[in-house]
Amino acid sequence: MLIELNGIKKYYNSKKNRIIALDGVDLKIAKGELLAIMGKSGCGKSTLLHILGGLTGINDGAYRYRGEKVDFENKRKLAEFRRKNVGFIVQDFALIGEKTVYGNVELPLNTRKLSRNKREEMVYEILNRVGLEDKVRRYPYELSGGEQQRVAIARALIHNPQLLLADEPTGSLDEENQRIILNMLKEVVKNGTTVVLATHDIDIAGECDRYRYISSGKIKEPEKI
């Protein structure tokens, strides 16, 4: 099992009260699985993805990755965990407007000691996989929404992560581009990467290997939706 969550709790304290984002979440995710996390806005989907990616800590429970407990208190190990294992995609693409497609995709390689030729080889290889090798010198504003999301996917995959987290990756796209992105994620899974995507769309969730529903910070079985 790639991931095991046991009794995960996450809350935020405001001046007036405590906001519970996740309330005792148990979840297992297998290697090479395409899993959808469904739910309405504010239900805890994004928080769950951030925990899986080591971007935010937990208040209680345990997160095990490949059988080893993720230590949220050790910032150095946590950063290493993210760098080695995790790719992240968000709905609004989060591309840097001043950088070309090449520059955006190359960003995750800045922490690695690679020759210019090797970096170029890796960037062109991943852009070829997402069908954007002819857009390499374009800027984000020159691309369609679907193309921008493909750039974001390429950037997330450039360091070959074992875990790809996608937060509403098709939410702002038309039906044709939704299909393109979903098929792309399925190909990623075929290559051995585990993909967890957050969505509010039952049709998107139905295309995944399985899905789980979050309501009021708790995981519900599909038959209980």
Regions found by a protein language model. Name each.
Residues 164-167:
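Catalytic Walker B motif of ABC-type/P-loop ATPase nucleotide-binding domains
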Residues 38-40:
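The feature captures the beta-strand-to-loop junction immediately N-terminal to the Walker
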Residues 99-107:
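Short coil-to-helix segment of the ABC ATPase nucleotide-binding domain corresponding to the Q-loop/switch region
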Residues 158-162:
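A short, proline-enriched helix->beta-strand linker immediately N-terminal to the Walker B motif
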Residues 139-149:
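Conserved ABC ATPase signature
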Residues 53:
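Helix-to-loop junction immediately C-terminal to a conserved catalytic motif
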Residues 61-72:
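Conserved ABC transporter NBD signature motif
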